[in-house]
A protein has these predicted regions:
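Membrane-embedded alpha-helical bundles that constitute the cytochrome b-like, heme-associated redox core
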Residues: 1-123
């Protein structure tokens, strides 16, 4: 009888997280968050048109620290997802597929996302 307590290969416990896997997961995660935020943005637009009380509640919420934090991260996710999508388009054309280029462009995408987000918020 075989040992049933052994880890199944490949298993997450034996892998060391790499920037390529983390950026891939982050790209999918930001896509899900952005898709979900479209629904919330639609509710916000309808509230502006039809319900004065809900409009005032939403405006006061997005003026608060928590609302601004949500907007900060949604904009950060959008910038990251957009830039990483451009990176994927270059990969589809066959550019930047060497592992060193993948790592360099990954760090560039992270850096540009943070820089552009802070630029949007503070300038």
């Amino acid at each position: 009888m075989q040992n049933k307590n052994r880890p199944i290969s490949p298993h997450l416990q034996i892998y060391k997280p790499q920037i390529t896997s983390i950026l891939s997961i982050a790209h999918r995660f930001t896509g899900i968050i952005l898709y979900s935020s479209i629904f919330l943005f639609t509710i916000f637009l309808f509230s502006l048109a039809f319900n004065e009380d809900l409009k005032n509640i939403l405006i006061s919420f997005f003026s608060s620290f928590y609302g601004k934090s949500i907007l900060f991260f949604i904009i950060l996710f959008f910038i990251y997802h957009f830039l990483n999508g451009i990176r994927h388009l270059f990969w589809d054309m066959g550019f930047g597929l060497k592992i060193v280029n993948v790592y360099i462009t990954g760090f560039i995408i992270i850096s540009l996302s943070l820089i552009l987000n802070f630029y949007i918020w503070f300038f």
